[in-house]
Amino acid sequence: MSESKRGGAQLARAVEKAYQAGQDDYHLEPMVLVENGKPVGKIGDGDAAVFCCRRGEREIELTELFTDPDFNKVQRNQLKDLDFVIMTMYHDKFKDLPIAFAPSHVVKPLAQVLSEAGKNQFHCAESEKYAHVTFFFNGGENAPFPGEDDVCVPSPKGIDFDQQPELSLPAVADQVMGALGKYDFVVTNFANGDVIGHTLNTAAKLEACKHVSHYLDVVVHDALAKGYVVAVTADHGNIEKLYTAAGKPDGAHTTNLVPFILMDPAHSGPIALRDGCLGDVAPTVLNVMGIPQPAEMTGKSLAEGHDFGKDRKMLLIICDGWGLGSGDDGDAIHLADTPYWDSLLAEQSWSKLHASGEHVGLGSGKAGNSEAGHSNLGAGRCVMQDDVRLDAAVKDGSFKKNPIFLQAIEHAKKNGTALHLLAYLTYKSSHGCIDYPLAICEMARDAGLDRVFFHIIFDGRSTEPGSAPKLLAELDEKLDAIGVGRIVDGVGRGV
């Protein structure tokens, strides 16, 4: 690859050397463009920066690094007069930052309806998925509703997740069983299907499936013995698909349907269930518990014809990244030793739910993700996701008129400084898309700002393994066509 004034070729060579040293895209160590012994494109006083990612998960910590004066997890210099823009509101602690696409609030999510009905509730997950059973499940609310207790179990630290495929599931199961009998509603997330599904380690995936099956057995039996109606479902697919069409290990989300299993210990016969989508789960919970469904919830109960009686309690288990696969040698759940899971499908009442694309407020044909999944599960309706709002803005031209972006560009122009774009190098991740920073780069060019620096986050999940050099070459060409912009550093998203 030849030298490039845009920096992509230089970064691509560094990536290829990292591959030779055994690194992959997800775990690429930081690499920086250097000229005359100095790093190029450092963020400095008076600059503007746009975090071109749309999810409120890993983005939170990096935003804290730049904006929170009390952040102390790493040593850093506090920059003066930095205009730091976030694409969406990753957390309500950032509500006073400039937000390009501020959230539309979910009115009357399940947790609020339960609270207003006088029911107490328990939300529990390990830290990798804690935000999903709280912030996302609760419609964007960070604070628990009255009567709601939230427990976060730390995920393993200092070790690659595929080396501990059970993650912290044993501790999560213990917390859930400790809550059963004390709360009217319990929701939990079993993270393994997604977290281990994102790795490329087939043996670890099979082991993860085994652990999920085992702890489903333990927790479900305890809940049924205590009189709880139990639902087991998923937020999207992932671990069930081991290989890409080219036969390579696959760590990406899928568009597969997900199961909805419902068990009522007070009823020995089958429960008539219909197929539906994730937005039908919250209405089902309300149906089970005998609580009127608010008009804001447009989903419908999946078990409308079943008489659950009065004063019922319910456990909802969300198996993250646990889709209905092909049932062959390319399906991890099928291959794994999962006797209890197999018995659920063989002996219990269950239906199929849509968990991707327009059914959960994503773009047509797009794989589901944890944020969309949990927001739909908790909202009881289809919740329009950020990628649809953003893509619509790009399509109708309003993206390039966004006043928050224009203010950031003007800030850099006024100070005679630079605009920095923090961006995922991918076209289809639920975290973001390289098209967003490219559009902002064009805006900067049109406004007469030529100092624009790209800070790349290598995805390693939605992209093919080893594809970073090719994607960097494509980005180089696009920046050449725009006429401004330089790629100055990169790091894997898992570092």
Annotated model-derived regions:
Residues M1-V495:
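Feature captures the catalytic ectodomains and active-site-proximal regions of enzymes
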